[in-house]
Structure formats: C-alpha cells, structure tokens
Swiss-Prot record:
Post-translational modification: The N-terminus is blocked.
Entry annotated with the keyword Transferase: no
Record comment: activity regulation: Inhibited by phenylmethanesulfonyl fluoride (PMSF). Not inhibited by EDTA, EGTA, beta-mercaptoethanol, indoacetamide, benzamidine, aprotinin, pepstatin A and trypsin inhibitor.
EC number(s) per entry: 3.4.21.-
Thermal dependence: Optimum temperature is 60 degrees Celsius. Activity is stable from 40 to 80 degrees Celsius.
Domain of life: Eukaryota
Keyword terms: Fibrinogenolytic toxin, Fibrinolytic toxin, Hemostasis impairing toxin, Hydrolase, Protease, Serine protease, Toxin
Species this chain originates from: Hediste japonica
Any one GO molecular function term: toxin activity
Protein name: Fibrinolytic enzyme
Stretches that traverse the bilayer: none
UniProt record, GO biological process: proteolysis
Keyword Thylakoid attributed: no
Length: 32
C-alpha cells in the first residue's frame, strides 16, 4: 500500500525529527 508506505517512511524518522523540531523551536523562542 503506497500511502501506508509513505506515511511509515515519513513517520518513522519524523518521530525523532519531531523532538528535534520541538527542541529547535524552544531554543529559537529562548534566544529571542
């Protein structure tokens, strides 16, 4: 299933990426 494959591929790495993103956003807010 193409959609499931794509979601899996995006979601797999993006779990770690999500935490990185949050970390980056928090850092960005604090640096202002």
């Amino acid at each position: 299933n193409y959609l499931h494959d794509t979601v899996g591929r995006l979601w797999g790495p993006s779990r770690a990426g999500l935490l990185d993103g949050l970390d980056w956003m928090v850092g960005d807010v604090q640096s202002r």
